[in-house]
Amino acid sequence: MAAYLVLMQEIHDLDGYRGEYVPQVLPLLQKHGAQTLVAGSDQQAAEGEPPNSTVVIRFADTEAVWGFLNDPDYQPVKEIRHRVTTRGQMVVAPEFTPGG
């Protein structure tokens, strides 16, 4: 069953995010069969005050999400994300199946 990685974060260094993090994370997402469904800052708050960036990535299953997050090649890339963002909230959630 598909699973989703949902990340809400405040990007405070856009040049670092776009110039360092994104080019390094995209090949790793491909390696793990991920599909980015939502990415960017063109969002409107329906309730509350969300950070300025939301990302939703679809994986084959929760094991694939954790495989990506725990990939040794991702660890230095994750450090870049931590450096250029704040207020990060990340969740891993399985796809909803009615009656399941």
Q: Where are the regions that the model predicts?
A:
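C-terminal structural segments of small proteins and small subunits
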Residues: 66-68, 73-91
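Short S/T/G/P-rich N-terminal loop/turn motif that feeds into the first structured element of a domain
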Residues: 1-53, 60-70, 94-100
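Basic side chains
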Residues: 18, 58, 78-81
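Generic beta-strand structural signal
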Residues: 53-55, 88-89
